[in-house]
């Protein structure tokens, strides 16, 4: 929920 795609798998 922060950074660019930190909560994304890759």
Curated annotation (Swiss-Prot):
GO molecular function: calcium channel regulator activity; toxin activity
Subcellular location, record wording: Secreted
Expression by tissue: Expressed by the venom gland.
Taxonomic superkingdom: Eukaryota
Post-translational modification note: Contains 8 disulfide bonds.
Gene Ontology cellular-component terms listed: extracellular region
Keyword set, alphabetical order: Calcium channel impairing toxin, Disulfide bond, Ion channel impairing toxin, Neurotoxin, Secreted, Toxin
Function text: Blocks contraction of smooth muscle elicited by high potassium-induced depolarization, but does not block caffeine-stimulated contraction. May target voltage-gated calcium channels on smooth muscle.
Family to which the UniProt record says this protein belongs: Belongs to the CRISP family.
Descriptive protein name: Cysteine-rich venom protein
Provenance organism: Daboia russelii (Russel's viper)
